[in-house]
Design a protein with these regions (language model features):
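NTP/phosphate- and nucleic-acid-binding module
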Residues: 1-196
Length: 196
């Protein structure tokens, strides 16, 4: 099966520029994990045995799962000039001389999706972090009889109008499904907030 990956590469004049880039990308991944995916991570440097083959330094973000195992959620590598020399990648500097650039590479994979599921899921389904949820709020009107439908739907629309500028709201007014079916369906989909 295909392993999906978001990856980037840069080349720099100086080692310091490459170091700054590699650390900045790690910070971006940590920011996403913590502030969008809602998962705390630890930023660190991999040991010589764990670093990316050919890298000078490998940085990573790691998250602790419910089973007390760590999951590597993203990496960023300082490659030095190792790959530019191996593949004869050069640039012409300001003195018109050929130089080998200092490179970086960085990436996250579908493992990050697994991290979100492992961190926020439970035995009933997925619980998406609000910033990632396609629908942040689902409103499920419970209409006991046709005579109440108009007033209940007016209330549902008032709720929607009051929150739709701040949240992504879905009104589940499907008449052919029971409230219990809808509750279960939206719980499985991981909607953070359900209003009945």
């Amino acid at each position: 099966s295909e392993f999906l990956w978001q990856e980037g590469h840069t080349a720099h004049k100086t080692e310091n520029e490459a170091t700054i880039e590699a650390r900045q990308m790690l910070d971006i991944y940590a920011e996403f994990a913590e502030n969008i995916a809602g998962v705390s991570v630890i930023k660190g440097i991999k040991s010589a045995n764990e670093r990316f083959a050919g890298a000078v330094t490998t940085y990573s973000i790691e998250a602790m799962m419910k089973d007390m195992k760590a999951l590597q959620a993203g990496t960023s590598h300082e490659l030095g000039q190792n790959f530019s020399k191996a593949f004869d990648i050069q640039y012409t500097d300001e003195n018109n001389e050929l130089q080998f650039p200092f490179q970086t590479s960085w990436g996250v994979s579908t493992r990050l999706i697994g991290l979100i599921i492992m961190a926020h899921g439970d035995n009933k389904g997925l619980q998406l972090p609000p910033k990632l949820a396609p629908s942040q709020v689902v409103v499920i009107p419970i209409i006991p009889s046709d005579e109440h439908k108009s007033s209940i739907m007016n209330s549902v629309n008032e709720i929607n109008d009051s929150v739709k500028s701040k949240f992504r709201v879905k009104i589940d007014d499907r008449e052919n499904l029971s409230p219990g079916f809808k509750f279960n369906e939206w719980e499985l989909k991981g909607v953070p907030l359900r209003i009945e």
